Amino acid sequence: MKKLLLLLVLTFSITCFAQEEKWSYPILPGTEAWIAFDTYQEKVNACQIPEDVLKTTSTSDLLDLCLAYPLLLDIYAFNEMSDGFNAYYSNFNGIREFMTRTDAVEALRERYQEELGQQESLLNNAVVTLIEKGDYVFRVSAIEMFLGCPQLQSNLSSSTQKEIVKNLLTGYEKKHESLSVFTGLGFHANVYARANIVNKLDPTLLLKAKNKNITRLLKGVNDDAGSVEKLDQISYSLIKE
């Protein structure tokens, strides 16, 4: 009996350790190993998640890895957000795996709500550094980008898409509560996401707006207040249906 009990304790301990041990990126920006890379492709290669880890990592943990991807910020190195996201999608096996998960939308919406829930306490906290606030803004924007990307939208029902638009509008309104922090790039991902979902739901909606710049929102080019205003009107009308 004692031997059986000991065996159960050991098995439980090993299982718990395996559950707690999570994969992390072995080489990070700023380290000597990272600085030693000669090419961008070497950095991309170093950030790939091993196949066995990809298949065994939970969707929630995989989302964490996608948000922690060392080259994620490079999305903004492109003139158009859509090009930046497509490069990220092409270069990183983690986001490609994430988009195949049947519970990807659920994980994204849950995480988005969590992030929005801590916005006020985080951004209004004098102890929180500007770097930490910047990380928060970028993290929220990345989640919005994921929610609206065509790779995710292709397999969603119209009802789910409308629910996501509703979530994004909640985030849009929350961001307006902290304009000093989100002004500029802080709104681009939200607009990009909603534009792509609206276009997937009904491509004629953007065309009916009769604004020559509104389709530019599909690429993440948010430089025309009139087109954003039209998109806002369309978005709010969708969630009232």
Walk through the language-model features, giving the residues of each.
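Short hydrophobic "helix-edge" motifs at membrane interfaces and signal-peptide entry regions
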Residues: 4, 21-22
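Sec/Tat signal peptide C-region and signal peptidase I cleavage site
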Residues: 14-18
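Non-catalytic all-alpha helical scaffold/repeat segments
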Residues: 19, 25-241
